[in-house]
From Swiss-Prot:
InterPro entries: NA-bd_OB-fold (IPR012340), Rib_uL2_dom2 (IPR014722), Ribosomal_uL2 (IPR002171), Ribosomal_uL2_bac/org-type (IPR005880), Ribosomal_uL2_C (IPR022669), Ribosomal_uL2_CS (IPR022671), Ribosomal_uL2_dom3 (IPR014726), Ribosomal_uL2_RNA-bd_dom (IPR022666). Belongs to the universal ribosomal protein uL2 family. One of its GO terms (biological process) is cytoplasmic translation. Gene3D superfamilies: 2.30.30.30, Nucleic acid-binding proteins (2.40.50.140), Ribosomal protein L2, domain 3 (4.10.950.10). One of the primary rRNA binding proteins. Required for association of the 30S and 50S subunits to form the 70S ribosome, for tRNA binding and peptide bond formation. It has been suggested to have peptidyltransferase activity; this is somewhat controversial. Makes several contacts with the 16S rRNA in the 70S ribosome. Keywords: Ribonucleoprotein, Ribosomal protein, RNA-binding, rRNA-binding. Pfam families: Ribosomal_L2, Ribosomal_L2_C. This is Large ribosomal subunit protein uL2. One of its GO terms (molecular function) is transferase activity. Part of the 50S ribosomal subunit. Forms a bridge to the 30S subunit in the 70S ribosome.
């Protein structure tokens, strides 16, 4: 889908660049596949802010998206493509041959009326699902499982994908968008194709108010705060903080490594950080 620009009637309109969503379904979502979603405003059960700069925004309902795709060898037809406020990608409503409805992540080049299927050996075409070990090397995939049967966790944002670049015994080697190469078990499943809405990265919000509609509040700098609020706070006049940049909780920011999960290090063949040097 193309990008939309607007006549510069206001500064916000002048800078606004949106994805043209005119081809998407304009009605309400399927009620059986939606549930209520309560806004937390970034507060936890004690009422304290646990996530800063969240709150407000338009009320949303959650669409239950099927990331597992575990109805094996039951063909499904794409009924329509829909907007989902909970994610950057579009979703597709599919109807299985037995009459069941489900929402899935819509891949690129999936159209209304297409037939998709999940199985051990299926055609390599967008929307089909099969174990990574049965896919040809070089296949573009998204919604990749990390644990067998848990449901897709990798490559789910708009326009993202991963590529199968090799095999290693029971595992396959997957190259992610970040440049990281990692081992994933061959029995983990993935969906063929790249995620829809690749133009999302080229959009421009245009004005602060539109960000407020999305539920984001103003982001304050630490150096503009008082010492009680941030390690960079305080000082007479404008100061640069006087110490190496840290988070509000005193941990070094600007590139300090925080990953501690050593048990899964063996699955990462090429770090996304090493690639950038």
């Amino acid at each position: 889908m193309a990008l939309k620009t607007f006549n510069p009637t206001t500064p916000g309109q002048r800078q606004l660049v949106m994805v043209d969503r005119s081809a998407l379904y304009k009605g309400k979502p399927v009620k059986a596949l939606t549930e209520g979603k309560q806004s937390s405003g970034g507060r936890n059960n004690t009422g304290r802010i646990t996530v800063r700069f969240l709150g407000g925004g338009h009320k949303q309902s959650y669409r239950t998206v099927d990331f597992k795709r575990d109805k094996v060898d039951v063909p499904a037809t794409v009924e329509r493509l829909e907007y989902d406020p909970n994610r950057t990608a579009f979703i597709a409503l599919v109807k299985y041959q037995d009459g069941e409805l489900a929402y899935i992540l819509a891949p690129q080049r999936l159209a209304v009326g297409d037939t998709i299927v999940a199985g051990n050996y299926v055609d390599v075409k967008p929307g089909n699902v099969m174990p990574l070990g049965n896919m040809p090397v070089g296949t573009i995939v998204h919604n990749i499982e990390v644990k067998i049967g848990k449901g897709g966790q990798l490559a789910r944002s708009a326009g993202t994908y991963a590529q199968l670049v090799g095999r290693d015994h029971d595992y396959v080697i997957v190259r992610l968008n970040s440049g990281e190469q990692r081992l994933v078990h061959g029995r983990c499943r993935g969906t063929i194709g790249a995620v829809s809405n690749p133009d999302h990265m080229n959009t421009s919000i245009g004005k602060a108010g539109r960000k407020r509609w999305m539920g984001r509040r103003p982001h304050n700098r630490g150096v503009a705060m008082n010492p009680i609020d941030h390690p960079h706070g305080g000082g007479e006049g404008r100061t640069s903080g006087g110490r190496h940049p840290v988070t509000p909780w005193g941990k070094p920011t600007k590139g300090k490594k925080t990953r501690t999960n050593k048990s899964t290090d063996k699955f990462i063949l090429l770090s996304r950080h090493k690639r950038k040097k």
